[in-house]
Regions:
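Flexible, low-complexity linkers/stalks enriched in Thr/Pro that connect modular domains
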Residues: 1-9, 96-114
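A broad structural signal for short, well-ordered beta-strand segments within beta-sheet-rich domains
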Residues: 6, 36-37, 94, 113, ...
Length: 183
């Protein structure tokens, strides 16, 4: 009597950033067992409801998918896999990933800007800008953000995201085609 094991359990989201998920994203667990198993029972995000389990090429390869909805809480995607081999031997329930893969974090919270400041390098005052001056907009968000689209004086600005992705800076150099402005 040999108990089955799960040699591979990985997780990913169909989000652009596969370690993140928001409402509407599909989270997929990939499961590879040591031998053929019956259809495993998989709970994700606190329930088996809404989880679709599909056999792959054979009964040792499985995927389990679930779509994130507004009712799911933010946080790391918890899961539980129970399974048995074809002979009925139960394997130990699995609740963690193999191989150090990234977990999927559900994040449905809209980021907000907590601080924003704008200044120029004008020698008469950082609130003024004339052609040739550089205007810098610094933004601090409440969580990591992707590169925002920023316009300064109605023109596209160059954006720099810092290593702590909650902080970014946007820079624009006033051209001679623009009037003096107060920023």
């Amino acid at each position: 009597k040999t108990l089955p094991t799960l040699g591979t359990v990985t997780i990913a989201s169909d989000n652009t950033y596969d370690h993140l998920a928001t409402s509407g994203d599909v989270i997929t667990l990939t499961i590879v067992s040591s031998e053929n198993i019956n259809t495993p029972t998989v709970s994700m995000l606190g329930a088996t409801t809404g989880v679709t389990v599909t056999q792959g090429a054979d009964a040792s390869n499985w995927t389990a998918t679930k779509t994130v909805t507004g009712g799911h809480s933010d946080g790391t995607t918890a899961f539980n896999i129970t399974f048995a081999d074809i002979a009925g031997n139960n394997g130990s329930a699995v609740t963690s990933l193999t191989g150090g893969d990234d977990a999927v974090t559900v994040d449905k919270t809209i980021p907000t800007i907590t601080t924003a400041s704008i200044a120029s390098n004008n020698s008469s005052g950082d609130e003024l800008a004339v052609p040739g001056n550089i205007i810098t907009l610094t933004i601090v968000a409440n969580e990591d953000i992707v590169e925002p689209t920023v316009s300064i004086a109605t023109q596209s600005a160059t954006v720099y995201i810092f290593s702590d992705a909650q902080y970014c800076s946007s820079v624009y150099s006033m051209t001679f085609n623009e009037s003096n402005v107060t920023i």
